[in-house]
Design a protein with these regions (language model features):
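Helical substrate-recognition/capping region of FAD-dependent monooxygenase/halogenase enzymes
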Residues: 2-36, 51-52, 105-108, 136, ...
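N-terminal Rossmann-fold NAD(P) dinucleotide-binding loop
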Residues: 42-43
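Active-site-adjacent segment of FAD-dependent monooxygenases/related oxidoreductases
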Residues: 70-141
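FAD/FMN-dependent oxidoreductases across multiple families
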Residues: 10-12, 270-336, 356, 378, ...
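Glycine-rich FAD pyrophosphate-binding loop
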Residues: 50-70
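Core beta-strand elements of the Rossmann-like FAD/NAD(P) dinucleotide-binding domain
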Residues: 29-31, 178-187
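A conserved short coil-to-beta-strand element within the FAD-binding core of flavoproteins
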Residues: 152-170
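Conserved FAD-binding catalytic core of PHBH/FMO-like flavoproteins
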Residues: 109, 139-140, 187-303
């Protein structure tokens, strides 16, 4: 398998099981970090930790990547994270970029939309890319990093923890084709999916709301001349009283989601003879005629919006679908999981280095639980709008859609899936509250907006200039710059490395940060703002750094 492999080769690729020296050890070998699950979240976390210098053991109970397209819609923030992990270019080169979409009601186009209406961003709002490609590029990147050891066909079958404390360990028993063996770990990341065995081993569960509806996913390969846009239909003439979603993927594959209703038979609806007339009717509506197609993959699913009460239990942190689940409307599942991984990686790295206390890992749970609640709220609202549960709800929904034909205010009420955006971590204990007045979106807790900048006389992108492994300070150039550079070095002494980056106090970046000469922004390793000042002192920056590290003052 290589970066140039096609979809069939990737899906047919098997990773070889290999016996580990741990299986012959006289006592359980110890690992600083064990990541369980080699999906997009587990692979992203393992790569991030390894790039920070941490040795990672990655376990997966299978020996293949995902089959079928599954998650396909990867958001701008996920692409920016993957840029830092060394796979963003491969993802974007293969993926289908899109920013535009259309919403239909019955026979009519209600309105188009643009998810990236402003210029000055390196990455698009979204790419569509089959999950098996994303996993393949991440697996290839992981194989390039000597600090990652991946063990395929290694299943965690039991987990026990010592009592809480600085020297605590997690004890794991791993089953393989050659029998079980034990290991210990300082920290475990459970990225083992929605049916998480590790969650069950700890006696935990996800709670929330299960939706009584069924949807058919059909991936069809066909040659059609349609724009690269997200098309969503409410009550289309070819599928009355239901909804339909159409997306382009690479390799002339199209993702089509058909709402079926709760009474649909999942096994019957997956049959090609049931799918054929549905796709033919859709193409008749879109093109005026049916087209030949090949059914590549089909699945019928129900879904839930739910999460664990806490994402951290002792020395085990849960990330991705093991911690939270949402409906597919809005592409919030895999995207939020990759953001989980980024949030956890820098904190775990600093804890392992002794640069931050264990308390920093508690903020992984609190911040990502906050993000999960936001995603669940948006996903639930979208699902309620798309699948009204009563006649009154349907009447309200349809009246809103009617208004949206001609009235822009009503379009804000139409919800075909509020698409994934990164969470601004309002209220995080790692944020330093503003003392000065600022405008715009770059508040403490927000992810940094990319933009064109000039560094050392060369044009470049802001996010590409931020350090891969540490904190950074954005200084907007002015007479104070030399003093600020000296002050930053003093403030960070004895804490963590802090990289200064001097930017022009005019231009796109300065506008987005509402910057004046001398404005300073303190950024976390995951590229979130944690503090900002019009005039910063060494005491300000030192205190904000300690706060962002969860170090007691």
């Amino acid at each position: 398998m290589s970066y140039s492999s096609d979809g069939a080769a990737i899906q047919n690729h098997s990773f070889a099981y290999a016996r580990s020296p741990d299986q012959d050890a006289s006592s359980p070998p110890h690992h600083p970090v064990v990541v369980v699950g080699a999906g997009p979240v587990g692979l992203s976390l393992a790569i991030d930790l390894a790039q920070r210098g941490q040795r990672v053991l990655l376990l997966d109970n299978d020996h293949r990547l995902s089959s079928g397209s599954r998650a396909i819609c990867f958001a701008k923030r996920t692409l920016e994270i993957w840029d830092r992990l060394g796979v963003g270019d491969a993802m974007c080169a293969k993926g289908v970029e899109w920013n535009l979409g259309k919403v239909f009601f019955g026979d009519d186009l209600l309105y188009p939309f643009n998810l990236l209406p402003e210029t000055g961003h390196q990455r698009p709002a979204f790419i569509n890319l089959q999950q098996y490609y994303a996993e393949a590029y991440l697996a290839l990147r992981a194989a390039e990093l000597p600090l990652i050891e991946t063990r395929w066909k290694n299943s965690v079958v039991s987990l026990q923890q010592d009592e809480p404390g600085a020297e605590g360990k997690v004890r794991l028993e791993i089953d393989t084709p050659e029998g079980p063996y034990p290991i210990t770990a300082s920290h475990v990341a459970a990225c083992d999916g929605s049916r998480s065995p590790l969650r069950a081993m700890l006696g935990q569960e996800s709670t929330g709301r299960v939706f009584r509806d069924r949807f058919l996913i059909a991936d069809v390969r066909m040659q059609v001349e349609l724009p690269t846009e997200r098309w969503f239909w409410f009550d289309p003439p070819f599928h009355r009283n239901q909804s339909v979603l159409l997306h382009r993927q690479p390799d002339n594959v199209w993702r089509i989601d058909f709402q079926l209703g709760w009474d649909a038979d999942p096994e019957e609806e997956k049959k090609p003879e049931r799918i054929q007339p549905r796709v033919d009717a859709m193409m008749q509506q879109a093109l005026g005629h049916a087209v030949p197609f090949e059914l590549e993959w089909a699945s019928v699913y129900t879904f839930a919006c739910q999460r664990m009460q806490s994402f951290k239990h002792g020395r085990v942190c849960f990330a991705g679908d093991s911690a939270h689940g949402v409906s597919p409307f809005g592409a919030r599942g895999a995207n939020s999981g990759v953001q989980d991984a980024e949030n956890l990686a820098w904190k775990l790295d600093l804890v392992l280095r002794g640069a931050a206390p264990l308390a920093l890992l508690e903020t992984y749970a609190s911040e990502r639980e906050f993000a999960a609640d936001e995603n669940i709220l948006n996903s639930t609202r979208a699902t309620d709008f798309i699948t009204p549960k009563s006649e009154i709800s349907r009447l309200f929904r349809d009246a809103t859609l009617d208004l949206a034909r001609n009235h822009p205010f009503a379009r804000r009420l139409v919800n075909s899936g509020r698409l994934s955006v990164p969470t601004t971590l309002h209220g995080s204990s790692l944020n330093t509250a503003d003392r000065d007045t600022f405008q715009g979106q770059m508040v403490p807790g927000s992810p940094v907006a990319d933009g064109p900048v000039e560094v050392d006389g060369q044009p470049c992108w802001l996010l590409r200039q931020l350090p891969a492994n540490g904190f950074s300070a954005l200084i907007f150039d002015g007479p104070q710059t030399p003093a600020l550079l000296a002050m930053i070095e003093i403030a960070a002494e004895g804490l963590v490395p802090l990289k200064p980056l001097v930017l022009s106090a005019s231009g796109v970046a300065a506008e987005r940060f509402d910057a004046l000469p001398g404005t300073l922004y303190l950024l976390r390793p995951d590229q979130h703002v944690c503090a900002r000042w019009r005039q910063a002192s060494v005491v300000d920056v030192g205190a904000a750094l300690r706060r962002a590290l969860a170090v007691a003052a």
